[in-house]
Amino acid sequence: MRKYIKIGVAGPVGAGKTALIERLTREIASKYSVAVITNDIYTQEDAEFLTKNSLLPPERIMGVETGGCPHTAIREDASMNLEAVDEMVARFPEVELIFIESGGDNLSATFSPDLADVTIFVIDVAQGEKIPRKGGPGITRSDLLVINKTDLAPFVGADLSVMKRDARRMRNGQPFIFTNLMKNENLDGVIGWIEKYALLKNIEDPASLVR
């Protein structure tokens, strides 16, 4: 029986996908066996960033160069990523969590169910308060929606209460959370969600989760 959980992390360029994974791994790597697979079209920039900045050793981080549409590599033809998962499991048979970061994408990104057991979609306040109500599969179907960079709301004229209202309407009961990853605000809520809904720990919902 498979003992590890694959967590897909998607979202637009610059929303904070890599930052989220970097902060998460810093907090949980001492508690769980973790590995990361990143996707970039022509480079391994995200993998290199994580290698330099996360607490994970380099052999636990693998970069996949998709060479084309990032949608395809996580959905229609996930073979490169599935091979990367197999290689990571061969390296670390005890692995418990594998984060798979998609290439920067739009609001329609979704993971193949063969590739991700649960999905996190990251958007950010700097894109404007209208982003949640634009919908798209990433916002409406992901298991957890992360709305990052709350500290920028005053500078871009975004009303967080409007974003909360719209996200609640679009998500139809599915959880979402506001974060400021620069200061680790509500990072504990994301960790709590992973423990409860990915690792199936018998714990309460984090207080920072919104439904």
From Swiss-Prot:
Keywords from the UniProt entry: Chaperone, Cytoplasm, GTP-binding, Nickel insertion, Nucleotide-binding
InterPro entries recorded: CobW/HypB/UreG_nucleotide-bd, P-loop_NTPase, UreG
CDD domains: UreG
Amino acids binding GTP: G11, P12, V13, G14, A15, G16, K17, T18
Molecular functions per Gene Ontology: GTP binding; GTPase activity; nickel cation binding
Pfam families: cobW
GO CC annotation, single: cytoplasm
Purpose: Facilitates the functional incorporation of the urease nickel metallocenter. This process requires GTP hydrolysis, probably effectuated by UreG.
Family note: Belongs to the SIMIBI class G3E GTPase family. UreG subfamily.
UniProt name for this protein: Urease accessory protein UreG
Organism: Actinobacillus pleuropneumoniae serotype 7 (strain AP76)
Lineage start: Bacteria, Pseudomonadati, Pseudomonadota, Gammaproteobacteria, Pasteurellales
